Amino acid sequence: MGVKLKWLLGFLVQGLETLPDHRHVQPVCCQHNVMVQQLEVEADEMSSFVQKKANKPWIWIAMDTPRRQVMACHVGDRSRTSAKRLWAKIPEAYRQHGTLYTNQYVVYAGVIPAAQHRAISKLARQTNHIERFNNTLRQRVSRLVREALSFSKKLTNHIGAIKLFICHYNLTRAAA
């Protein structure tokens, strides 16, 4: 066929870099300061690794609960800085008027305003949709499977694969 593997990999990386930051999410608009529905967001973080188990980037995800669309994603460490970056990527209407459900991880409390934040235990089952999405992400993106032979060698490819899956997931959710 005449296509070299090096060119093909470069082409794929270029394609991953051009994926939209909005991830094809259809956020709720707040027109004329009137909200018709309550905005609910579930946020969570999950571990992954790049190249070796010691190199652990964390995947931070925020999901519009009623619509089941991933609205924000950040890959970084497990610090308050990463929580702030996830918060900054959430659409403005949700940051202003939404209720955010998270696990009881301490860094969320310093980032999300107290009036909007609900730190929930696993028994309350208010974060079951985001937990289910995390499982789906692990199943469908082979480099996130635990104890697997496939893994990312570069962080940019790791982020690109996650972003590609989320874009596809949101497009299928919007059509449903």
Set out the residue ranges of the language-model regions.
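Residue-level recognition of single "structural anchor" positions
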Residues: M1-A176
